[in-house]
Amino acid sequence: MTMKQPVRVAVTGAAGQIGYSLLFRIAAGDMLGQDQPVILQLLEITPALKALNGVVMELRDGAFPLLADVITSDDPMVAFKDADYALLVGAMPRKAGMERGDLLGANGGIFKPQGEALGAVASRNVKVLVVGNPANTNALIAQQNAPDLDPKCFTAMVRLDHNRALSQLAEKTGAAVSDIKNVTIWGNHSSTQYPDLSQATVNGKPALEQVDRTWYENDYIPTVAKRGAAIIEARGASSAASAASAAIDHMHDWALGTKDGEWVSMGIPSDGSYGIPEGLIYGFPVRVKDGKYEIVQGLDVSDFSRGKMDATAQELEEERDEVRKLGLVK
């Protein structure tokens, strides 16, 4: 196998829990393939640089054939320089008693300068994935502060919800995850998201013919939407390894394409498809070819789906209005 030229992969919050699960898999080739060397460009806040150096020691000790180099910095202008891929993981977590507006404001202080730095120094074709929550609106903030980059460079992660939707359906039906196709997560990475099985198949047969409608509406949808809270409750910490795995899946499919006849869910800028307000970063069903994603068009939308899709869009509009008031987006 001939090796390609190394690509530059920037990761923020690199010394955190998700970063720790993510970096070794990128270095092992899980994200971009076994023939693609990578240069990791890791960003952390100044107090975490010492811990980050420990992670770098471990990365070097992994002796990964695909790991061409590792760069660390507390300056986004250094970490994002010529980046081909950027995974924005570092964010301000919600603390007890914090209102959504406070959280959006605190994250604006992170994602506005990061958007500006990406716009200034990243590759013009950079693929940006925002993992740090609230991911959709953080992605919007970064995107709006990088006007020189194509808006489609910016995406938000709903793949964790998508993977949760697959695994819950597999558990219920006794099928393997690989036998399930075309689940969709519409909207926000929040409890208003809509895990949609109307187009999904299990072993080639419609999913909704194999499960009870009451279970779907009253158990399945809330279980998928609130899974993150259930993990915090059980583990005493938020989902990190599964989030890292979903980030790998999202970037892998964006870089290398989706399988024929299948789609995945990505948070992307709405072009008005399915009546979703243009410009919102919203979870859609997408197919990817040659590194470009396209929304799957022409899917039937029932009244039930319409209500769910509009409710999560409304939440995203409210978040956008809040960050607009704070002067973080246009």
Swiss-Prot record:
UniProt keyword annotations, A-Z: NAD, Oxidoreductase, Tricarboxylic acid cycle
Positions contributing to substrate binding: 94, 100, 133, 164
Active site annotation, chain numbering: 189
GO BP, one annotated term: tricarboxylic acid cycle
Transmembrane segments: none
Domain of life: Bacteria
Catalytic activity: (S)-malate + NAD(+) = oxaloacetate + NADH + H(+)
Alphabetical list of InterPro entries matching this protein: L-lactate/malate_DH (IPR001557), Lactate/malate_DH_C (IPR022383), Lactate/malate_DH_N (IPR001236), Lactate_DH/Glyco_Ohase_4_C (IPR015955), Malate_DH_type2 (IPR010945), NAD(P)-bd_dom_sf (IPR036291)
E.C. number: 1.1.1.37
Keyword Iron-sulfur: no
Residues engaged in binding NAD(+): 13-19, 107, 114, 131-133
Gene Ontology molecular-function annotations: L-malate dehydrogenase (NAD+) activity
Pfam families: Ldh_1_C, Ldh_1_N
Classification via CDD domains: MDH_chloroplast-like (cd01338)
Family under the similarity heading: Belongs to the LDH/MDH superfamily. MDH type 2 family.
Known role: Catalyzes the reversible oxidation of malate to oxaloacetate.
The protein's name: Malate dehydrogenase
Organism of origin: Deinococcus radiodurans (strain ATCC 13939 / DSM 20539 / JCM 16871 / CCUG 27074 / LMG 4051 / NBRC 15346 / NCIMB 9279 / VKM B-1422 / R1)
Lineage: Bacteria, Thermotogati, Deinococcota, Deinococci, Deinococcales
